[in-house]
């Protein structure tokens, strides 16, 4: 029995060691290969968008959908084109809720009777009182502040039937032994891309923006996996 418990504990320790951080002991975090985040696969969600006939540009026209102006570079509109995403997030939110509830109830009864007979006199009385008092108070406050200013290049990975573009971009910066990773993805309209091939983040539909990283500082800030497991299953 003791050998079995020891084997289970050893297997758990080995499972905890088989992660990327264990393989990077003594060296800086490895960067992802170029183009690793550009694999585009058809997803069922794309079926939600209606199919529309592709716009055909007249051969005699001087303008087309890709051209922003006569003397400007063409805008990104095809798979493989590159555009710049301008991320300027400066959000602040404050919520404060207060609840106060009170109820008081009181009731009373008084009964009495008396009588006289030839043999004896009798009298009785009774009092009954009851009351209740309940009170509930609640106070909650939430404050949030986020500020992020970044520019990241993204690649057009797909074109929907209605002409909207699927974009995906990532940026990795390694300073000493800490790797910062920025990912952005979403759906944009070609008309929202300006003449400099720049689009603001608030014009990206289904935007997915993540800014994080991994490295020595991140490992220290995160609790060990054993502690996370205990916190997950502990009822207290």
UniProtKB/Swiss-Prot annotation:
Biased segments, Polar residues type: 105-122
Lipidation (S-diacylglycerol cysteine): 17
Lineage per the UniProt record: Bacteria, Pseudomonadati, Pseudomonadota, Alphaproteobacteria, Hyphomicrobiales
Encoding gene per record: flgH
Name of protein: Flagellar L-ring protein
Keyword annotations of the record: Bacterial flagellum, Cell outer membrane, Lipoprotein, Membrane, Palmitate, Signal
Cellular component aspect of the GO annotation: bacterial-type flagellum basal body, distal rod, L ring; cell outer membrane
Cleaved signal peptide residues: 1-16
Function: Assembles around the rod to form the L-ring and probably protects the motor/basal body from shearing forces during rotation.
Organism in which the protein naturally occurs: Sinorhizobium medicae (strain WSM419)
Keyword hit for Glycoprotein: no
Protein family according to the UniProt entry: Belongs to the FlgH family.
Keyword Membrane assigned: yes
InterPro entries registered for this protein in UniProt: Flag_Lring
């Amino acid at each position: 029995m003791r050998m079995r418990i020891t084997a289970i504990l050893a297997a758990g320790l080995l499972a905890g060691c088989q992660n990327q951080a264990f393989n990077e002991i003594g060296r800086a975090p490895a960067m992802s290969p170029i183009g690793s985040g550009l694999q585009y696969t058809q997803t069922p969600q794309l079926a939600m968008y209606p199919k529309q006939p592709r716009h055909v540009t007249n051969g005699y026209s001087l303008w087309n959908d890709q051209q922003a102006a006569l003397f400007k570079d063409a805008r990104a509109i095809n798979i493989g084109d590159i555009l710049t995403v301008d991320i300027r997030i400066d959000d602040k939110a404050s919520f404060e809720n207060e609840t106060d509830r009170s109820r008081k109830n009181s009731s009373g009864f008084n009964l009495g009777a008396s009588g006289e007979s030839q043999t004896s006199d009798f009298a009785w009385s009774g009092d009954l009182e009851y009351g209740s008092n309940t009170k509930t108070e609640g106070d909650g406050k939430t404050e949030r502040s986020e500020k992020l200013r970044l520019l990241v290049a993204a690649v057009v990975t797909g074109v929907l039937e209605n002409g909207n573009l699927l974009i995906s971009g990532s940026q990795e910066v390694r300073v000493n032994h800490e790797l910062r990773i920025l990912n952005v993805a979403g759906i944009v309209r070609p008309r929202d891309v300006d003449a400099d091939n720049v689009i603001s983040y608030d014009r990206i539909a289904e935007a997915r923006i993540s800014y994080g990283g991994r490295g020595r500082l991140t490992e220290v800030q995160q609790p060990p996996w054993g502690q996370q497991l205990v916190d997950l299953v502990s009822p207290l």
